[in-house]
Amino acid sequence: MDADIELVLAAVDSSDEAVDAAEYAIAIAERYDADLHLLHILDQRVMRGVEAGDVSAETVADQQRAVTGRVRERLPETVALSHSGAVGFSPNRLGQTPGSVVLDAAEELEADFLVVPRVSASGTRDEVLGKAALHVLEYASQPVLSV
């Protein structure tokens, strides 16, 4: 008996590892005839840089579009793609972490399967999504693939 998977959520940042994780999400979506949603997670440091004028908002948007484009290139025609963005941390909400953002988005979108990368492009676990993976694995009510 096949699992009932209609929407796969893949959490991504601008790293190659996130795109690799999205490729797994594509394979799952294709296998189960599901749709794919990319959730772009922004690091608080990036948002502070944008707010301070040190980082161009257009550059951040270009990076997100590039990731979406790389995923779209690999996407079969049978898989519908949607995407959204969220900030991984909030100075106003102490409980808002990258992991909680992924879980909240999964609940809001009614995602049936989650895919999160464990390590960022720098290879350190200090990056946003690397930290999120453990939280998502521990608290998700959906199946999770962490790659």
What kind of feature is each model-predicted range?
Residues 113-135:
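Glycine-rich, Arg-bearing micro-motifs that act as flexible, cationic patches
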Residues 3-52:
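Small/aliphatic-rich secondary-structure junction motif
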Residues 34-35, 111, 142:
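Short glycine/serine/threonine/alanine-rich loop segments
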Residues 143-147:
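Short hydrophobic/aromatic patches at helix-to-coil boundaries
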Residues 2-3, 45-114, 125:
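Charged, low-complexity cytosolic intrinsically disordered regulatory segments
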Residues 32, 132, 139-141:
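Short, structured coil segments at secondary-structure junctions
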